Design a protein with these regions (language model features):
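Acidic, serine/proline-rich low-complexity intrinsically disordered regions
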Residues: 3-268
């Protein structure tokens, strides 16, 4: 499997409104400059750069491009100020009940440990080099299917963490980068404002090391989990891309014969 084929597969097996986004960190200036994608000439929040990439835009970013202080902190392009680190900053805005809880949020977030010289944010299908992180923002049904694809090879996902804050920058990017594992987010009010996500959209971050097996897992779990209506769409999208659709089996699901109904006899 390669990147282009994996995108063809995932966009066939899932009915995505947005294309998967690849994130690559550069820690060498020469490598960053040689990466043939134009650097954005304006400020942008990191989360909105992901949103733009999900609609086909490709860009490189440096610390000068960062339009959100919290996103820049997660990416280690800005130092974490003391009021944020000690919990007083968020407590002052009544985000958390007390200083202990507020500080625990800062303590438990996983930011980059080394500052990158730059970041590439673009549609996954555009990459020739391997990105570090893949982000999919979609409806809960599609994120469920990605989780099921992950579970096919990995079992239970035990370390999902989110708190409705720093959703794209920390939940989906730096937390995933540090743990080398998937994570989900329900997004946060900030990114929903500046990136204008739809109300029903949530996200999942995937380390590239797990990407191909997740795509394969989504494919393998299609017949047990997808209903006939969804299978019709999958079959159509596969054929439109010239991909093999012969493995799609209708009238077959994991829960066949499991449910019962009808009138019951009551006592008395």
């Amino acid at each position: 499997m390669d990147i282009k084929y994996s995108v063809d597969l995932i966009e066939s097996y899932l009915d995505l409104d947005r294309t998967p986004v690849g994130i690559k960190f550069f820690f060498d200036w020469e490598e960053f400059e040689k990466f043939e994608v134009p650097q954005r000439d304006r400020k942008v929040t990191y989360c909105n750069s992901v949103q733009l990439a999900s609609r086909g835009k490709a860009m490189k970013l440096t610390k000068e491009n960062q339009g959100c202080p919290n996103g820049a902190m997660a990416l280690k392009m800005r130092e974490v100020p003391e009021p944020m680190a000690n919990g007083k900053g968020r407590l002052s805005k009544n985000i958390y009940h007390n200083i202990e809880i507020s500080k625990s949020i800062s303590d438990e977030m996983l930011f980059l440990e080394e500052e990158p010289v730059g970041i590439a944010v673009m549609p996954l299908e555009n990459y020739e080099l391997e990105p570090d992180i893949i982000i999919i923002v979609s409806n809960p049904y599609n994120i469920m299917r990605v989780i099921q694809g992950h579970g096919y090879f990995n079992g239970y996902t035990s370390n999902l963490r989110t708190v409705g804050l720093q959703a794209v920058c920390q939940d989906l990017t730096t937390y995933t980068y540090n743990t080398k594992d998937i994570n989900i987010t329900l997004l946060c009010p900030g990114t929903r404002l500046v990136a204008n996500w739809q109300a029903n959209e949530i996200g999942i971050g995937i380390p590239f090391e797990k990407w191909y097996e997740i795509v394969q897992g989504v494919k393998e779990t299609t017949n047990p989990f997808e209903r006939n209506k969804e299978k019709e769409g999958i079959q159509k999208r596969l054929r439109e891309r010239g991909l093999d659709a012969s493995n799609i089996r209708f009238n077959e699901n994991y829960d066949d014969g499991s449910y019962s109904g009808g009138k019951i006899e009551t006592r008395g």
